[in-house]
Design a protein with these regions (language model features):
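Non-catalytic interaction/Regulatory regions outside core domains
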Residues: 1-45, 51, 55-172
Length: 172
């Protein structure tokens, strides 16, 4: 891990109003995501997405590519969580790794399924989130996966994302 002197927005001690608290949390998460990419050897990009495929945050990735990646990898996460195992039960996938000629892709469930599974504060109207990481082909897959888990522990307080609801729709 490198030792960056840069501090997260919350660590600066700047007082905020309740209206800007959500913005500060988002900035803190974005800072953690950028630091993760800077600190973990071989990792080149990271995207936090909603389970339904919307890009929430990224590590300064091209926005069009991050949007495309978010849509595709939410599908990967969905498929992985709907495969029955040897017990004939659907269980959440802890991690999916895709090995390509040009990169390694890692997908881990975040939010309720990883950070808040079985927690009594789970409320209706929330959607799971997913962390996607892109690494070089020679990256240490075990180290990248381990560091993703550590990042998700740091994200845990921020991981509940409201479900999108259209006009006239209600959350069911």
């Amino acid at each position: 891990m490198s030792t960056h002197s840069e501090m997260s927005p919350a660590a600066t001690g700047v007082a905020t109003t309740s209206a800007s608290a959500a913005s500060l949390q988002r900035e803190d998460m974005a800072w953690l995501l950028r630091q993760f990419v800077a600190d973990v050897p071989g990792v080149t990009h990271a995207v936090l997405l909603s389970r339904d495929g919307l890009r929430l945050l990224d590590s300064e990735v091209d926005k069009d590519w991050a949007d495309e990646l978010s849509a595709a990898l939410s599908g990967v996460a969905s498929i992985a969580s709907n495969i029955t195992g040897p017990t004939h039960e659907k269980r959440p996938a802890r991690q999916v790794m895709i090995e390509r000629d040009d990169c390694l892709l890692f997908v881990q469930s975040a939010g309720q399924s990883a950070a808040f599974g079985g927690h009594p504060s789970n409320e209706r109207g929330l959607v799971d989130t997913v962390l996607a990481v892109i690494a070089a082909t020679d990256a240490d897959a075990g180290a990248a996966g381990f560091e993703m888990g550590r990042l998700l522990q740091k994200f845990a307080p921020f991981m509940q994302i409201p479900v999108r609801v259209g006009t006239g729709d209600e959350v069911r």
